[in-house]
Amino acid sequence: KIWRS
């Protein structure tokens, strides 16, 4: 992902 995986 992008935010905190």
From Swiss-Prot:
The keyword Secreted applies. Keywords: Ion channel impairing toxin, Neurotoxin, Secreted, Toxin, Voltage-gated sodium channel impairing toxin. One of its GO terms (cellular component) is extracellular region. Its main location: secreted. Expressed by the venom gland. GO terms for molecular function: sodium channel regulator activity; toxin activity. It is found in: Secreted. The keyword Secreted applies. It comes from the Eukaryota. Belongs to the non-disulfide-bridged peptide (NDBP) superfamily. Has a weak inhibitory effect on voltage-gated sodium channel Nav1.2/SCN2A. Weakly inhibits acetylcholine esterase in vitro. Increases interleukin-6 secretion from macrophages in vitro. Has no antifungal, antiviral or cytotoxic activity. Negative results: has no effect on voltage-gated potassium channels. No effect on voltage-gated sodium channels Nav1.3/SCN3A, Nav1.4/SCN4A, Nav1.5/SCN5A and a sodium channel from B.germanica. This is Venom peptide 8. The lineage of its organism: Eukaryota, Metazoa, Ecdysozoa, Arthropoda, Chelicerata.
